[in-house]
């Protein structure tokens, strides 16, 4: 694992074989859980806070994939995240959004982010999924930890986004773009209480060809 802070970004020295992940830190304590899980899987991770880099500089780093961390705000307050999601879509750069990052994916394509029916803080939920994308090879349902007060509104979900996981009541817990390598999970795979967190991240790394 190689960790880098918010110093001036360095382009990948070998564009053809670049395997670096760019993780956007939305000022959340779970960010480094994600970093450590990715490090367990052998990934090189560059970390930048959401207001300490612009989209042009982020894309100039030529990341093999982008991860949008959880955070305490909504997508409109998450620095470059919405614009970076659009840039990832334009360049077909694989992206994984976690919690706030998942909501950002939904909003970036026209979905609405609304108040959840209940605020959850460390609540376990059963994830019912289709076995695709980051959920490939996982049992359904499985238990995962939730910390959120916002959700992507199912009624406003655009056709280009597919629901890949949900709670029993239909609350969206996972999204995937139908044509692009863009994924989101509302829960926290990086929580020690979530089942199969490493495997979900490995599935994303397989997508961006970052070796374990």
Predicted features, each with a name:
Residues 191-212:
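Acyltransferase
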Residues 44-50:
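Short hydrophobic/Thr-rich beta-strand motif most characteristic of the beta2 strand and flanking loop
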Residues 21-38:
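N-terminal beta1-alpha1 ligand-phosphate binding loop
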Residues 19, 63-137, 141-143, 201-203:
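Cysteine-nucleophile active-site neighborhood
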Residues 54-62:
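Short amphipathic alpha-helix with an adjacent loop that forms part of the alpha/beta core around
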Residues 131-179:
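Catalytic beta-strand/loop cores that center a nucleophilic Ser/Cys/Thr
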